[in-house]
């Protein structure tokens, strides 16, 4: 065999090996989930599954179920509280013009299909002031994410609003965008967690939230 022939054979063998290695590497990163399961994961990221659909993922694909949100009623938790901050009286003696200030807090927690797994918790705080006649001040809300699961990506703030309306009530709302990813596939959906508040004259606070 001539030197040229040996070189050609060696090159062919090298190319074949490279091709085989590339094919093997591609197989390693290929999704192990059937197409219908990926479709079910996308559905879970957009809204509530039926109990049968959720149970299938939990029993057959527990690693996948751990990274998917559970939007079925009663599966997420929330908590709210108001912390007294300070009281300041103005120059008038009337009780209805006494200004008080507090900080309201609300946390919205999203859990996965695996009940014990928290995907994230978003807590929002708003400092506000009022008297008996009107809300006098609402600061922009400030939020913090805790217990963020590895397949949840906090992409950024969508809106941050604080205002007082014509009825002298205060309002605040904070919303974020979170990407929901699953192994081997990537992003299958996005949630938009938010906390919102309404502040009444006299200091009453109403709050709500969602994803």
PLM-predicted stretches and their roles:
Residues 1-110:
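N-terminal prepro-regions of secreted/extracellular proteins
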């Amino acid at each position: 065999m001539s030197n040229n022939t040996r070189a050609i054979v060696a090159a062919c063998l090298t190319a074949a090996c490279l091709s085989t290695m590339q094919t093997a590497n591609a197989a390693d990163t290929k999704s192990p989930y059937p197409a219908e399961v990926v479709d079910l994961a996308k559905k879970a990221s957009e809204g509530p599954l039926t109990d049968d659909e959720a149970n299938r993922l939990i029993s057959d694909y527990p690693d996948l179920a751990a990274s998917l949100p559970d939007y079925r009623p009663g599966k997420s938790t929330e908590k709210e509280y108001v912390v007294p901050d300070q009281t300041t009286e103005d120059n008038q003696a009337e009780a209805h013009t006494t200004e008080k200030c507090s900080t309201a807090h609300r946390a919205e927690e999203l859990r996965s299909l695996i009940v014990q797994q928290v995907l994230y918790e978003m807590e929002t705080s708003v400092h506000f002031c009022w008297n008996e006649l009107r809300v006098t001040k609402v600061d922009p809300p400030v939020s913090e994410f805790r217990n963020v699961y590895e397949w949840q990506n906090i992409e950024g703030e969508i809106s941050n609003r604080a205002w007082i309306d014509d009825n002298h009530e205060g309002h605040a709302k904070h919303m974020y965008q979170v990407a929901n990813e699953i192994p081997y596939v990537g992003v299958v959906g996005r949630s938009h967690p938010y906390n919102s508040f309404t502040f009444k004259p006299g200091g009453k606070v109403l709050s709500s939230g969602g994803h």
